[in-house]
Amino acid sequence: MTVDYLEFLKRKSVIDPDTGLASTPALNPMLYPHQADMVKWALRRGRAALFADCGIGKGPMQMEWADKQPHECIIAAPLAVAHQFVREAEKFGIDLAYAKDQAGITKRLTVTNYERLENFHLDQFGAVALDESSILKNYSGAYSTWMIEAFKNTPFRLCSSATPAPNDVMELGTQAEFLGVMTRGEMLAMYFTHDGGDTSKWRVKGHAQAAFWTWMASWAVMIRKPSDLGYSDDGFILPPLHMHEHCVSVHAPSSGFLFAVEAQTLQERQAARRDSIGDRVAACADLVNSSDRPFLVWCNLNAESEALAAAIPDAVEVQGSDTDEHKEAAIVGFLDGRYRVMISKPKIAGLGLNLQHCADMAFVGLSDSYEQLYQS
């Protein structure tokens, strides 16, 4: 092939252009080298995604990005994580404030909960950062569609998540669409095919594998540890995770059966969880009550949560039906040590919170969501 033809092919490749800062200012010296590299890249990009694993420092990177870009910025975070941002900002000398609505804005940088975004005039912000942006993965959801539409003209956009596509690689399309890189439909048409007549089963085309990941690398950076960018992993290697399995025997037959059988389908697993609540709660309560250390107890059913709260005297319970004020107060109280035990569901309190003071947790059974298990 001639040089001219190679140049022609290069121009035909799909690479999203940078739209951010032509030159990046000096960054906070408290950032680790891998964090500084990622922030500089995201500032040059303008619309970028930081898909960094848990513990890599997405919070400081998001705040530094927000601080160094030139516009008013709003950061959206899960419940109680917003207040965590404020505490972290103080450590890094970043002027950031929490607000519940438009009237509460006092700084150039504002952090709020996802649930409260509709209380703001979003067109006044020139920058937005989504913490735990995997919230966008449910493309058919009205909220995801609203988010994409609300920020489609915002010049600086940042997505951050350790699990951007926990179920299927095609979920990356909603992140790309939010950032204005490419719509989900365009991504599927260009890089994906579906098997047979089931259009929900998409996979990357064999010949498009390299092109797809090259395109991804033009707008997203993905790392699991600093050495992925050539830096030392010192301080980022977590201690080994010790998992202890406690088996609860169930002898009573499930509904519709003459005797107890192994749960195979989703419906059978759900029935087994409901039928064994009492035994599982009792086993967990014995374990937690015999300890004097901070403890996180994860459950999936409201009945489990209520039974656990009754069986563990010094626990605070966080349910989905609670007010936002109660949820925030309970989670912050657990973080501050006012409560030794917190009982909640991974989908409520399992995303984004830094709970390093608590080394012990119990799962009163597991759901079918790997993302919830990994994040919590």
Annotate each predicted stretch with a short phrase:
Residues 59-64, 70-92, 166-171, 300-302:
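Conserved Walker A/P-loop ATP-binding site and its immediately adjacent core
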Residues 9-51:
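Conserved pre-motif I regulatory segment
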Residues 45-65:
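Walker A/P-loop
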Residues 369-376:
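Conserved SF2 helicase motif VI
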Residues 296-298, 306-309, 313-349, 372:
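Conserved helicase ATPase core of P-loop NTP-dependent helicases/translocases
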Residues 268, 272-300:
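Conserved interdomain hinge at the start of the Helicase C-terminal
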Residues 70-73, 91, 127, 135, ...:
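Conserved P-loop NTPase motor "coupling/switch" region that bridges the ATPase
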Residues 80-103, 179-182:
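Conserved helix-turn-beta segment of the N-terminal RecA-like "Helicase ATP-binding" lobe
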